[in-house]
Amino acid sequence: MNKKLHWKSLGTGTTNLILIHGWGVNSKIWSILVQSQLYQHFKLHFVDLPGFGHSNQLLPMTLNDTAELLSVYIPKNSILLGWSMGGLIASKIALNYPQKIKGIISVCSSPCFIVRPNWPGIPKKIFLKFYNKLNINFDRTISEFITLQSHNTNYLEIKNLKQQILSQPYPTIYTLKKNLETIFKTDLRTKIKKLKIPMLRIYGSLDTFVPKKIREILDILWPKTKSITIAHASHIPFVSHQKEFYESIINFKNYLNTLKITCQK
């Protein structure tokens, strides 16, 4: 029985890129990156979050505890890349352990996923309905989730992605629900505003989970961060729009190199 965090490193580059997956899936969501140009530019670190994939024997943790656990594995001067819920985790790591982090990339994520006064997001009623209907049919839930969020994506690539994800150990319903609770209650809008680490935010113009209005608001709230929206992309742009996605990641790495950043003391 494996009760350790599953962590795998690949790539020929010298810059550490930590890939943090989102809700319901595992590190296989990034499988397409292994064959990409990112492999030459970065040392890619794939992690299965507590309760997911080959870390499924670990109980789900709070956002703080997850950040603490991952920080033990993260090399100094790393770039964090968090997708969806993984963006919350990446942000929390950067807030709690800035001395290790060179930059943050948030992909189709939000500091606050749920709608609030003067803030767009997922309506509470819709979120709670999904939470209450979550059942043991994990295959169907994840398959439908990926399909709905994969507009303009090659059918065979999506089929292969589903197979890769579902080939790994499944999370429990308890894990799925505890992570949904974390998404529901987390609001990092004010805290991230104070973060001094360079940040890139990537959005998809057709993303139904993270409304495009969020980019416009955060461009004002967080003027020191960079942002791009990939046209015609939904919630999984690293699969549907690989060229644009890879270019944005490499350009951000090159930008960080011009700053000659060494991590905060």
Curated annotation (Swiss-Prot):
EC number: 3.1.1.85
Cellular compartments annotated: Cytoplasm
BP terms from Gene Ontology: biotin biosynthetic process
Pfam families according to UniProt: Abhydrolase_1
Keyword tags: Biotin biosynthesis, Cytoplasm, Hydrolase, Serine esterase
Record pathway: Cofactor biosynthesis; biotin biosynthesis
First-tier enzyme category under EC: hydrolase
GO molecular function: pimelyl-[acyl-carrier protein] methyl ester esterase activity
Principal localisation: cytoplasm
The keyword Hydrolase belongs to this UniProt entry's keyword annotation: yes
GO cellular component: cytoplasm
Binding residue positions for substrate: 23, 84-85, 145-149, 235
Active-site residues annotated for this sequence: 84, 207, 235
AB hydrolase-1 domain boundaries: 17-240
Subunit: Monomer.
Function as written in the Swiss-Prot or TrEMBL entry: The physiological role of BioH is to remove the methyl group introduced by BioC when the pimeloyl moiety is complete. It allows to synthesize pimeloyl-ACP via the fatty acid synthetic pathway through the hydrolysis of the ester bonds of pimeloyl-ACP esters.
HAMAP family linked to this entry: Carboxylester
Name this protein carries in UniProt: Pimeloyl-[acyl-carrier protein] methyl ester esterase
Species annotation: Buchnera aphidicola subsp. Baizongia pistaciae (strain Bp)
